[in-house]
From Swiss-Prot:
It holds the Pfam family RecA. GO terms for biological process: DNA recombination; DNA repair; SOS response. Keywords: ATP-binding, Cytoplasm, DNA damage, DNA recombination, DNA repair, DNA-binding, Nucleotide-binding, SOS response. The keyword DNA repair applies. Belongs to the RecA family. CDD domains: RecA. One of its GO terms (cellular component) is cytosol. Signal peptide: none annotated. ATP binds at G65, P66, E67, S68, S69, G70, K71, T72. This is Protein RecA. Can catalyze the hydrolysis of ATP in the presence of single-stranded DNA, the ATP-dependent uptake of single-stranded DNA by duplex DNA, and the ATP-dependent hybridization of homologous single-stranded DNAs. It interacts with LexA causing its activation and leading to its autocatalytic cleavage.
């Protein structure tokens, strides 16, 4: 009976391959287990919280939060990090609010960045889909879902009712995009805004725009919030920011990271390296003094960060140690099978 079942399965698989091409159905163990490729977010704490060292290529990601919480800044940092890897990036600016001067300050190579400012939501998503299908773009940012206005709404009158139009548009687009994004190994990030549900008595009244489709299709969802101000004397020079990983299909979810976003500079990376170095025991802190490998690197956090900025090799060394300690290492199938093969050869 078992032989008959195996023969039937073999016949079905060969027929599927003939009809749909090689690789249409395969055993999961046939492919080598590899770490999911990712691009850094520019924040060490967030890279660790995501579990794979950043945002995953070949997946859809949603970043949402209140106004002025750092959503666009975070995505521009992702573009800057991807460009350092030699990747091609595109920014679909549906809000028509991208500032090239600010983007350049965050490390984005604006000369190489593809930018589109579409008129309608349909046009924006069609452009994004064509870029994905070209297999030549590695990171696409859509800013934002709330600004993807359906054509019927733009051509209609101000008071016209267009219930559910945007949700239907997003649902249809994501059905097309999700497979293409995977095949092209492209990271697609949707920025989203928050709205309040009316009449909610229990639970959070907050919801994101564009219906529920994006919540399902996203492999990673990040909730970004401003939790305080960074001050230099009486002057506010930045935001204290908290990011929660509310959904994660590539690593355990519900972790969070806190970091500073400095005005005109972006994520304060050195402060994170220093804080996490102290937390993991790679940097010694005695009173106000910080020391690394027995050598004092500064009195007070500001001086220690300045030292790390001037000595990037030491900063990179501390960061590498933190990543090595906190990032999970994938178990390769080949290494697990190697001893058995060796024993077979000896026999």
């Amino acid at each position: 009976m078992e032989d008959n079942r195996k023969k039937a399965l073999g016949a079905a698989l060969s027929q599927i391959e003939r009809q749909f091409g090689k690789g249409a159905v395969m055993k999961m163990g046939d492919q080598p287990r590899e770490a999911i490729p990712a691009v850094s977010t520019g924040s060490l704490g967030l890279d660790v919280a995501l579990g794979i060292g950043g945002l995953p290529y070949g997946r859809i990601v949603e970043i949402y939060g209140p106004e002025s919480s750092g959503k666009t800044t975070l995505t521009l940092q992702v573009i800057a990090e991807a460009q350092k890897q030699g990747k091609t990036c595109a920014f679909v600016d549906a809000e028509h609010a991208l500032d090239p001067v600010y983007a350049e300050k965050l490390g984005v190579n604006v000369d190489e960045l593809l930018v589109s400012q579409p008129d309608t939501g349909e046009q924006a998503l069609e452009i994004a889909d064509m870029l994905v299908r070209s297999n030549a773009v590695d990171v696409i940012i859509v800013d934002s879902v709330a600004a993807l206005t359906p054509k019927a709404e733009i051509e209609g009158e101000m008071g016209d009712s267009h219930v559910g139009l945007q949700a239907r548009l997003m649902s249809q687009a994501l059905r097309k995009l999700t497979g293409n994004v995977k095949h092209a190994n492209c990271l697609m990030v949707f920025i989203n805004q928050i709205r309040m549900k009316i009449g909610v008595m229990f639970g959070s009244p907050e919801t994101t725009t564009g219906g529920n489709a994006l919540k399902f299709y996203s492999s990673v969802r990040l909730d970004i919030r401003r939790i305080g101000s960074v001050k230099d004397g009486d002057e506010v020079v930045g935001n204290e920011t908290r990011v929660k990983v509310v959904k994660n299909k590539v690593s355990p979810p519900f972790r969070q990271a806190e970091f500073q976003i400095m005005y005109g500079k972006g994520i304060y990376h050195m402060a994170e390296v220093l804080d996490m170095g102290v937390k993991e025991g790679f940097v010694d802190k005695s009173g106000a003094w910080y020391a690394y490998n027995g050598d004092k690197i500064g009195q007070g956090k500001a001086n220690a960060c300045k030292f790390l900025e001037e000595n990037l090799d030491i900063a990179n060394e501390i960061e590498a140690k933190v990543r090595d300690k906190l990032m999970p290492k994938p178990v390769k199938k080949e290494t697990a099978e190697a001893p058995a093969e060796a024993n077979g050869e000896l026999l």
